[in-house]
């Protein structure tokens, strides 16, 4: 039971030591451990002031992690939105990531389909659905599956 400010801070720091967390996610995890909201807010405010809790670092880390796993910007945007982050902050993090999304798309497609272009409409639809599910735009998918680089 997290019933004093020091215990809440320690639990929050334990979670942050493992990986970056957003404020909403950290709040949810601390509530689950039984911490009252007023102690959570105070502890997280202090951690943010000290630079130990940073939404910007969390966004940067999450975008890079999911992009390495082969997910596109639309999927990442949706996942971050579900985690309670502001749409503007998410869009800014995606822009600042420096990721070449078309190259990410190509690598994801290469891993899944070994660079084999679809032979017919059924295969094209199958590959397109997979890549759209991964979070890439239909425009980018169309360019890739037509064999165009630009």
Curated annotation (Swiss-Prot):
Entry-linked Pfam families: RecX_HTH1, RecX_HTH2, RecX_HTH3
Keywords, sorted A to Z: Cytoplasm
Principal subcellular localisation of the protein: cytoplasm
Localization (cell): Cytoplasm
One Gene Ontology biological process: regulation of DNA repair
Keyword Cytoplasm recorded: yes
Signal sequence coordinates: none
GO cellular component labels: cytoplasm
InterPro entries listed in its UniProt record: RecX_HTH_1st, RecX_HTH_2nd, RecX_HTH_3rd, Regulatory_RecX, WH-like_DNA-bd_sf
Similarity comment: Belongs to the RecX family.
PANTHER family associated with the record: REGULATORY PROTEIN RECX FAMILY PROTEIN
Summary of the function given for this chain in its UniProt record: Modulates RecA activity.
Protein name as it appears in the record: Regulatory protein RecX
Lineage: Bacteria, Pseudomonadati, Pseudomonadota, Gammaproteobacteria, Pseudomonadales
